[in-house]
From Swiss-Prot:
Sample GO molecular function, one term: DNA binding
Function per UniProt: Controls the expression of several small proteins that may play a role in biofilm maturation. Binds to and represses the operator of the ycgZ-ymgA-ariR-ymgC operon and also regulates ynaK. Binding is antagonized by BluF upon blue light (470 nm) irradiation. Blue light may increase the affinity of BluF for BluR, allowing it to be released from its operator.
UniProt domain HTH merR-type: residue ranges: 3-72
The protein, known as: HTH-type transcriptional repressor BluR
GO biological process: negative regulation of DNA-templated transcription; regulation of DNA-templated transcription
Gene inactivation effect: 3- to 20-fold derepression of several genes coding for small proteins including the ycgZ-ymgA-ariR-ymgC operon. While the BluR/F system is induced at low temperatures under blue light irradiation, it is not essential for growth under these conditions. When both lon and bluR are disrupted, levels of OmpF decrease, leading to lower drug susceptibility, with a greater effect at 26 degrees than at 37 degrees Celsius. The mechanism is not yet understood.
Originating species: Escherichia coli (strain K12)
Ranges of the DNA-binding region feature: 6-25
Signal sequence range: none
């Protein structure tokens, strides 16, 4: 029987090794073998279980309830994403940056990035914009904490093999969201360099040998599609990022 290291499994399944360790230690979802040196060893059955765990989480099930679902056929609901959103709002109302950072770090270890961004962070950011009882300071504090964590994650991912790319916001004023998308891309094998300010035109001729990833926050306009096609015909590596 073939066995795989935690690094091999993380790359194959698209899951951060820290998340795999949390699934094992905190939630009892995985039971890998151990080498003589004490290192985790996973087999094909473990990998299948990881994929099943990912499917449950993608369906909106909180990681703490996945173990029971692996042993039964019942399914949770989206209510737990709402619970996490409410928890984040409560922390923000405390105006405690240290507690906010700590919770963002812990969530990053427990849930896949895509699910956190789509079901927790983006909904909370939207609620902060719409909630007239929430000061702009809270929204700014939340964005600052997210950018800080995303930047740290980008740095950590550079220690692993990956492809270099430059990410830029194309005519969209969403700095915090840009960093969230950089974080999302980094866990797909990219070493991302972020251009912090919005760009009116990507100017790929300035980066002739590099890969550019452009993000617009919405579907590209007709003109943007024309430019993307033109740049491709010119031999430039310009990728449109649509999360």
């Amino acid at each position: 029987m073939a066995y795989y290291s935690i690094g091999d499994v993380a790359e194959r399944c698209g899951i951060n090794p820290v998340t795999l360790r949390a699934w094992q230690r905190r939630y009892g979802l995985l039971k890998p073998q151990r080498s003589e040196g004490g290192h985790r060893l996973f087999d094909e059955e473990d990998i299948q279980r990881i994929e099943e765990i990912k499917r449950w989480i993608s369906n909106g099930v909180p990681v703490g309830k996945v173990k029971a679902l692996l042993e039964t056929t019942s399914q949770d609901t989206e209510d737990d994403w709402s619970r996490l959103q409410e928890e984040m709002m409560s922390i923000l109302r405390m105006a405690n940056p240290a507690k906010l950072r700590a919770r963002i770090i812990s969530l990053g270890r427990e849930y896949p990035v895509d699910q956190l961004i789509n079901h927790v962070y983006l909904p909370v950011r939207q609620r902060l914009v719409l909630d007239h009882n929430t000061s702009r300071i809270m929204s700014s504090m939340f964005d600052g904490a997210l950018i800080e964590y995303a930047a740290t994650s980008l740095f950590e991912m550079r220690r692993k093999p990956g492809k270099e790319a430059i990410l830029m916001a194309w005519n969209v004023e969403e700095r915090a969201r840009l960093w969230l998308e950089a974080w999302r891309l980094s866990l797909s094998g990219w070493h991302i360099s972020v251009l912090a300010d919005p760009i009116e035109s990507p100017r790929p001729e300035l980066f002739p040998t590099q890969t550019l990833i452009v993000w617009t926050g919405m579907a590209p306009t007709r003109r943007q599609n024309e430019l993307l096609q033109h740049w491709g015909e010119q031999g430039y590596k310009v990728i449109f990022h649509a999360p």
